[in-house]
């Protein structure tokens, strides 16, 4: 059963990342609408999860730990940071401006086909634009830059702290053995 789910998730993700045909264009459009220039990340996660389900043949339980929290903070800081601009939107214009940006990225006379060369103007998608506008309207753009930097640093620390500590411990053990 999980093998079938894994295969379906893998195939849908591959179709989306290839951006061919109506279904591929639609999946890419939805992902770009939500995540902007990071539209490929959900597809890469889908491919990885699909492989995992196919190969392991057992259910995957998401463990909420500090590493996952760090990855989420890094993702949020990337989405917000890529949506910041020199002239922040207000709540009344954020959705209209984003809709204009994504409409400009759509190929003429098509519904969902995006020009991937024009996707850079989308920033972090509607998620990033909303969060950036929320932060800019409450703590100004300078405060938002500070929040993005802090989110990134905390996320990196939470993600890699255990790994760095293990490397330091192993190097200390190696030095002790070398001295003996």
Feature names for model-found ranges:
Residues 1-179:
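Alpha-helical transmembrane segments used as membrane anchors
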């Amino acid at each position: 059963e999980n093998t079938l789910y894994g295969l379906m998730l893998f195939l849908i993700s591959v179709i989306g990342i290839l951006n061919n045909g109506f279904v591929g264009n639609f999946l890419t459009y939805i992902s770009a609408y939500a995540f902007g220039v990071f539209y490929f990340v959900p597809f890469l996660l889908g491919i990885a999860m699909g492989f995992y389900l196919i190969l392991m043949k057992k259910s995957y339980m998401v463990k909420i730990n500090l590493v996952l929290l760090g990855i989420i903070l890094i993702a949020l800081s990337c989405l917000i940071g890529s949506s910041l601009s020199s002239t922040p939107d207000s709540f009344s214009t954020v959705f209209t401006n984003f809709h204009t940006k994504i409409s400009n990225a759509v190929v003429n006379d098509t519904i969902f086909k995006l020009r991937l060369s024009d996707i850079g103007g989308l920033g972090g998608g509607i998620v990033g634009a909303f969060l950036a506008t929320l932060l800019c309207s409450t703590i100004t753009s300078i405060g938002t830059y500070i929040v993005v930097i802090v989110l990134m640093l905390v996320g990196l620390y939470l993600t890699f702290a255990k790994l760095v500590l293990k490397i330091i411990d192993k190097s200390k053990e190696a030095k002790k053995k070398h001295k003996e």
